[in-house]
Amino acid sequence: SNYGKLLRVDQYPIQNYVILDFVLDTGNAAGQNMVTLAAKVACDYIKEKTGADFFLESGFNSDKKASARNMIMGRGHSVIAETTIKSSIVQRILNVDISELEKYQELGPTTSRLAGTQGTHLHISNALTAIYLATGQDTACVAENSIGHFQIESVNDGVKFRLTLPSMTVGTVGGGTRLLAQQQNLKLLGCHEGENSSKKLAEIICASALALETSLLSALASDTFTKAHMKYGLSLI
């Protein structure tokens, strides 16, 4: 591999099995295929030396699946985005009072826990899917990457919006990033080159998701959610 560097191999014994979790730094690549190939070579070597059988994929890495493991331990990039908006701007642009935002914030996480959903957010997957398609990412990874934690906090003369995305498998080299249109979009974002270009892309995606979470929260709290859909969606059909 031109990008992969083995950091460690974690061991998780269960029943009469041992799960080996290969942890790699994949540079600016998302790295799923890279890790798979590296793990195959390592497991073949272990089998040759010990005679132990193995399955390359156990499901423990939660690839393309939402899991508590990836929320806690992360997979790929982990990003926290935060912004503070003044009360006057919240009222003028988002058309909502901070007190209404706080009321909805009390309700949303409670009902989500009742439903058994993972994470506390509204629709992170919308932002991720759009940008993943535009920048050549593996859109199937939205299933695991869209689990996050959205929070608001009242501050002096404003409100702080905060979003944590603990598991983002994105890259700026390899895979769909080689496509011409996707390369052009990465250039527009300033993520087509540089040592930390994949980190920058992850930050942009998280910030975009935060903006979308803020918008939907405001629409729901101010009871304008349906109105917006009727004006910009159904009325055009």
Roles of regions detected by a PLM:
Residues 160-237:
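Internal helix-turn-beta structural module
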Residues 24-178:
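Glycine-rich anion/phosphate-binding loop at the beta-strand->alpha-helix junction
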Residues 12-22:
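Short, conserved phosphate-binding/catalytic loop or strand-edge motifs used
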Residues 4, 13, 49, 154-158, ...:
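A generic structural signal for short, non-catalytic loop/turn and secondary-structure boundary residues
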Residues 2-11, 49-61, 100-104, 138-146, ...:
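Flexible, glycine/charged-enriched surface loops at secondary-structure junctions
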Residues 10, 115-116, 192:
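Short secondary-structure boundary micro-motifs
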Residues 15-16, 120, 197:
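Hydrophobic alpha-helical segments with strong N-terminal bias
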